[in-house]
A protein has these predicted regions:
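Short, solvent-exposed amphipathic alpha-helical segments in soluble enzyme
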Residues: 22, 128-131, 203-207
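Glycine-/Pro-rich loop/turn segments that contact NAD(P) or position catalytic residues
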Residues: 1-35, 39-49
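C-terminal substrate-binding/catalytic lobe of Rossmann-fold NAD(P)-dependent oxidoreductases
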Residues: 30-186
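A glycine-rich, Thr/Ser-enriched phosphate-binding loop motif common to dinucleotide/cofactor-binding enzymes
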Residues: 4-15, 63-66, 197-203
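Conserved residues at beta->alpha junctions
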Residues: 10, 116, 189
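Short, contiguous clusters of charged residues that form electrostatic/catalytic patches at enzyme active sites
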Residues: 14-18, 70, 74, 172, ...
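NAD(P)-dependent Rossmann-like dehydrogenase/reductase catalytic/cofactor-binding core
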Residues: 166-221
Length: 221
């Protein structure tokens, strides 16, 4: 048997890891506080009872917070080659997460506060978000969006109804960046939980593996 098992992160982690990757690369991260407002489609079908979610917020999603608190560090960590084994050394910043379910069909919204290792200005953080180009762009993957992320300057954006389907649901939207009186900065991250966070991530992984020559043609005759 030839192949590999590729695991995707939690769909909420996708919307968190993207802006954290930029901040870690540019300024370094010390601490992160995140509260998620997760769409009901993330619970699958039939999902959450209409009587439970209609006009309500459910402040608990089983096993969700522990995933969000550990996965970003692992994703942004580094690979270390040992004898006959490759291990992951997670990044050292701390993540504190609260995950909630809200009456929205599609689109996870995250309220994120960060403490950076190096002091910087609001303008430089905006510039880092606006100018970021992922290294995977060189592969020109078929399912990848033209814009990996976009930064919105309107006070009331991003919103699931207006922004979750941006570029067929594959673009992550950031906005409401402002100083945080407790940490350094706070902002909103929004992405489509099933298109960018779950199914789309799986397809991108397969396309990436093919582009990197990791998939072999199999003759099943």
């Amino acid at each position: 048997w030839h192949g590999a098992i590729v695991t995707n992160p939690n769909c909420t982690t996708v919307m968190l890891a993207v802006p954290l990757a930029i901040l870690e690369e540019q300024f370094g991260l010390e601490a992160v506080i995140v509260t998620s407002m997760q769409a009901i489609s993330g619970a699958g079908y039939p999902g959450v009872s209409a009587l439970d979610i209609e006009g309500n917020v459910i402040p608990f999603i089983r096993n969700e917070e522990s995933k969000v608190e550990s996965e970003s560090n692992k994703i942004l960590g580094r690979l270390v080659k040992g004898e006959n084994v490759i291990s992951i050394v997670p990044e050292s910043f701390t993540v504190s997460a609260t995950c909630t379910r809200v009456p929205v069909i599609d689109g996870h919204t995250l309220s994120i506060s960060v403490k950076l290792k190096s002091k910087t200005s609001l303008e430089r953080v905006v510039e880092a978000f606006q100018n970021y180009k992922p290294k995977t762009m060189v592969y020109n993957l078929p399912s990848a969006p033209k814009h990996f992320l976009r930064f919105l300057e309107e006070d009331d954006r991003p919103q699931p109804r207006l922004d979750a389907e941006e570029e067929e649901g594959m673009c992550i939207s950031l906005g409401r960046l402002r100083p945080c009186p407790i940490l350094d900065f706070k902002f909103i991250s929004l992405g489509h939980n099933t298109e960018r966070g779950a199914a789309g991530a799986s397809i991108l992984n397969a396309e990436m593996a093919l582009s990197m020559g990791m998939l072999k043609e199999v003759d099943n005759r």
